[in-house]
UniProtKB/Swiss-Prot annotation:
Pfam families: PEPcase. Keywords: Allosteric enzyme, Carbon dioxide fixation, Cytoplasm, Lyase, Magnesium, Phosphoprotein, Photosynthesis. The lineage of its organism: Eukaryota, Viridiplantae, Streptophyta, Embryophyta, Tracheophyta. HAMAP family: PEPcase_type1. This is Phosphoenolpyruvate carboxylase, housekeeping isozyme. It comes from Saccharum hybrid. Its main location: cytoplasm. By light-reversible phosphorylation. Its EC number is 4.1.1.31. Belongs to the PEPCase type 1 family. Signal peptide: none annotated. One of its GO terms (biological process) is photosynthesis. The active site is at H172, K601.
Length: 966
């Protein structure tokens, strides 16, 4: 290896240490982890593709690091010169290298966070003040509630065992990493964690280092790009893989920790195994709003698949339980059941089992009971498998478990018997874990929500009323619709027969209801209606459930997402509750979903956040008035523009009384991996949600003072006006947006099964919130997040400078306002208007340059005003750890941004001149066929060879670097 290459290799480490010069604490190993992964990767890169490629990567990195230090745009031009001189194969290798290095930096961060957390637990306290505000350790929370708020242990226990957090996994098209890679990333994390363990021998260290290099190389050699869009079944399988990997075992482990925390505050009883603390639901295969690929058949398949997976997971554990429960003493109640089972069981039915394959003798009573449970689980799985494969099964339903009570009954019997015989400690072992899994996951693993647009139900109702000859439902007033729906709901006659004339769309809606009727009711959760505005939207779904013979109707959940819908939501709910039939039907419980994405796209983050806050307060008041317990279902995205942000803070900043021990929240696309990708991440997620929900209920945040509200109302009007004047009223905004961002190329990423537009060839209104945010995140300009804040602050400060004091008081005393400001501050820390200016220079027509300049001036002004309100001199001065992590990531992202901007230029402007230099990459397999082979992976591209793949790799890399996509 040449001498200068060695110098360069050390210089990347040196650059890293320049970016993050000093350790933030004794347990700060981030730069160490990052440097190790980077060194290993660069050695692998050199072995695979030669010294020249390694040097080019290092040159780009160093120029990017220099840009980050000096913010000199000349550096960006220099990176551009290096990148445009590459041939297509080299271009792909270099881009892939940066994308890969960013992923390694993320993995180093995760290992560092886990390491600091372990140190914290050993010390028994928070590492620093910051983590106290962003972490929610369950034990810490219980102690705080008792000591600071003087709650009794019993009060805490009662609140905890009655609360529910329902996490709803959605396949939103934002998980841009393939599963093949996610698994390799998990193994890299494990190797890195073990390498830094205290008691490791030199031999183990060497073996781990080799394993680490193997995994880094395997990940680098895997195609990052999905070559076909995932189907809803693919998305469902990907989501379910997290249950298999972490959630399944993570839940009982977490509940044991809750038991320990309770014991430490003086509660000598465990959480009841059926306490519904954590529940899981899913939208994968149930969310048909704007996704024509989710058909009734797919919904049916997804439910059967989930049942099969659940039975598989139980089957894998039941024999361990049989080994554990080898006792012969049992209660009389259990003995009766054992004798009955023993008499009726056949001797040769268990040959297909590995363990306990002969009939179990009655002298092992628990094993007799569990053997019967095992048979039923086997049949449950096989029946689901047959139905999935052919739609038919010879296994009768009565030989399977059809509902969770049937499944729990024999397990509860074993538990009671063990306790009665003095073996409670045995009962509280694996059996308790198993009972908790059954209570949490049931037979369906997750409950599937159905989501459909209200218009689709109106179409069905219209077809029915036309068929009955009573006019057009669509043209009726709301009063007339309600009157007719209620008379039908109160009546007994069927509404229509098989001869109802149906278009494909109408058949699709009705067939979905038939699937709900056909499958076991525990497969389903809520029926969510998007674009719901009136009581008739909800009543129509109730009537369709009855007409299609849904035995146990799903609860109907209206979803309010646009700003105007949120404003009108309380009145809509009051009208719904005033319908006596409906009040009798819901039994004092209602769920309402509020959408963060569309409200943000519609009015900007400031106004959306404030309107969501006020809407929740008003909805809760309406529910109180009618004596209804309201559960809020939060449709949050991963990005700040779509309502994302740290879980703990997001929950604690909700209005008082809006959570009250029951919370539903979506865990979307890219956030699933960050929440459940590893055992410790899964544990942390469950802990954060549980602790923050408990704290919000027992120690609600303060209500805003009247003068704060008045100021917020005034600012929201100004913020909305500015946001809309630019996004919707500026005549050339859409043109600028499409030129200055990769929005038009987004669809090529094959991220999700859902189209990125509701209607082709329309403006911003029809663009889904996800690609809208994705495009601005890619250029690091984040316009939807900050636009409006600056105008709002400027307006109230110009009006009266004393308002600055009020705003600072709001920031220091009101959690909602603080979280809103802190999240935007974090986005500014990730943003870079210099990068956005490069996109403008290369991609936007000259007559629009002044528009981009104006937006960037607005960005800078907003940032300064935000810092003034927060009382900060620099961005993130209160969170040095996050600041350090972002500094380390920035150089990689900058190199990818420059590459992306030039790729877009080459794709969009065929006349753009580039002068490729000599081919750099050497490939060890065949010197005649180097990296150019990579170009052939994409056979469908309409662009010049290699351009599309390079562009997609930049999108994925930047998404990994921003740690959120859409």
């Amino acid at each position: 290896m040449a001498r200068n290459a060695v110098d360069k290799a050390t210089s990347i480490d040196a650059q890293l240490r320049l970016l993050a010069p000093q350790k933030l604490s004794d347990d700060d190993k981030l730069v160490e982890y990052d440097a190790l992964l980077l060194d290993r990767f660069l050695d692998i890169l050199q072995d695979l593709h030669g010294e020249d490629i390694r040097e080019t990567v290092q040159e780009c990195y160093e120029l990017a690091a220099e840009y980050e230090n000096k913010l000199d745009p000349k550096m960006l031009d220099e990176i551009g010169n290096v990148l445009t001189s590459l041939d297509p194969g080299d271009s792909i290798v270099i881009t892939k290298s940066f994308s890969h290095m960013l992923i390694l930096a993320n993995l180093a961060e995760e290992v560092q966070i886990a390491y600091r957390r372990r140190i914290k637990l050993k010390k028994g306290d928070f590492v620093d003040e910051n983590s106290a505000t962003t972490e929610s350790d369950i034990e810490e929370t219980l102690k705080r509630l008792m000591h600071q708020l003087k709650k009794s242990p019993l009060e805490v226990f009662d609140a905890l065992k009655n609360q529910t957090v329902d996490l709803v996994l959605t396949a939103h098209p934002t998980q841009s990493v393939r599963r093949s890679l996610l698994q390799k990333h998990g193994r890299i994390r494990n190797c890195l964690t073990q390498l830094y363990a205290k008691d490791i021998t030199p031999d183990e260290k060497q073996e781990l280092d080799e394993a680490l290099q193997r995994e880094i190389q395997a990940a680098f050699r895997t195609d990052e790009i999905r070559r076909a869009p995932p189907t809803p079944q693919d998305e469902m399988r990907a989501g379910m893989s997290y249950f298999h990997e972490t959630i399944w075992k993570g839940v009982p482990k977490f509940l044991r920790r809750v038991d320990t925390a309770l014991k430490n505050i003086g509660i000598n009883e465990r959480l009841p195994y059926n306490a519904p603390i954590i529940q899981f639901s899913s939208w994968m295969g149930g969310d048909r709003d704007g996704n024509p690929r989710v058909t009734p058949e797919i919904t049916r398949d997804v439910c059967l698949l989930a049942r099969m997976m659940a039975a598989n997971l139980y089957n894998a554990q039941i024999e361990d339980l049989m080994f554990e429960l080898s006792m012969w003493r049992c209660s009389d109640e259990l003995r009766v059941k054992v004798d009955e089972l023993h008499r009726s069981s056949k001797k040769d039915t268990t040959k297909h089992y590995i363990e306990f394959w002969k009939q179990v003798p009655p002298s092992e009573p628990y094993r007799v009971i569990l053997s019967d449970v095992r048979d039923k689980l086997y049949n449950t799985r096989e029946r689901a498998r047959h139905l999935l494969a052919s739609g038919f099964s010879e296994i009768p339903e009565e030989a399977t478990f059809t509902d969770v009570e049937q499944f729990l009954e024999p397990l509860e019997l074993c538990y009671r018997s063990l306790c009665a015989c003095g073996d409670r400690s045995v009962a509280d072992g694996s059996l308790l874990d198993f009972l908790r899994q059954v209570s949490t996951f049931g037979l369906s693993l997750v409950r599937l929500d159905i989501r459909q647009e209200s218009d689709r139900h109106t179409d069905v109702m219209d077809a029915i009323t036309e068929y009955l000859g009573i006019g057009s439902y669509r043209k009726w007033t709301e009063e007339k619709r309600q009157e007719w729906l209620l008379s039908e709901l109160n009546g007994k006659r069927p509404l229509f027969g098989p001869d109802l004339p149906k278009s494909d769309e109408i058949a699709d809606v009705l067939d979905t209801f038939h699937v709900l009727a056909e499958l076991p009711s525990d497969s389903f959760g809520a029926y969510v209606i998007s674009m719901a505005t009136a009581p008739s939207d909800v009543l129509a779904v109730e009537l369709l459930q009855r007409e299609c013979h849904v035995k146990k109707p799903l609860r109907v959940v209206p979803l309010f997402e646009k700003l105007a819908d949120l404003e009108a939501a309380p009145a809509a709910l009051a009208r719904l509750f005033s319908v006596e039939w409906y009040r009798n039907r819901i039994n004092g419980k209602q769920e309402v979903m509020i959408g963060y994405s569309d409200s943000g796209k519609d009015a900007g983050r400031f106004s959306a956040a404030w309107q969501l806050y006020k809407a929740q307060e008003e909805l809760i008041n309406v529910a109180k008035l009618y004596g209804v317990k309201l559960t809020m279902f939060h449709g949050r995205g991963g990005t700040v523009g779509r309502g994302g942000g740290p879980t703990h803070l997001a929950i604690l900043s909700q209005p008082p009384e809006t959570i009250h021990g029951s919370l539903r929240v979506t865990v979307q696309g890219e956030v699933i991996e960050q929440s459940f990708g590893e055992e410790h991440l899964c544990f942390r997620t469950l802990q954060r949600f549980t602790a923050a929900t408990l704290e919000h209920g027992m120690h609600p945040p303060i209500s805003p003072k009247p003068e704060w509200r008045a100021l917020m109302d005034e600012m929201a009007i100004v913020a909305t006006k500015e946001y809309r004047s630019i996004v919707f009223e500026e005549p050339r905004f859409v043109e600028y947006f499409r030129l200055a961002t990769p929005e038009m190329e987004y669809g090529r990423m094959n991220i999700g099964s859902r189209p990125s537009k509701r209607k082709p060839s329309a403006g911003i209104e029809s663009l889904r919130a996800i690609p809208w945010i994705f495009a601005w995140t890619q250029t690091r300009f984040h316009l939807p997040v900050w636009l409006g804040f600056g105008a709002a602050f400027k307006h109230v400060l110009d009006k009266d400078i004393r308002n600055l004091q009020t705003l600072q008081e709001m920031y220091n005393q009101w959690p909602f306002f603080r979280v809103t400001i802190d999240l935007v501050e974090m986005v500014f820390a990730k943003g870079d208007p210099g990068i956005a200016a490069l996109y403008d220079k290369l991609l936007v027509s000259e007559d629009l340059w002044s528009f981009g300049k104006r937006l960037r001036a607005n960005y800078e002004e907003t940032k300064q005003l935000l810092l003034q309100v927060a009382g900060h001199k620099d961005l993130l001065e209160g969170d040095p750890y996050l600041k350090q992590r972002l500094r380390i990531r920035d150089s990689y992202i900058t190199a990818l941004n420059v590459c992306q901007a030039y790729m877009l230029k080459r794709i969009r402007d065929p006349g753009f001149q580039v002068n490729p230099g000599p081919h750099l990459s050497k490939d060890i397999m065949d010197m005649g066929k180097p990296a150019s082979e990579l170009v052939k992976l994409n056979t469908t591209s309409e662009y010049a060879p290699g351009l599309e793949d390079t562009l997609i790799l930049t999108m994925k890399g930047i998404a990994a670097g921003m740690q959120n996509t859409g």
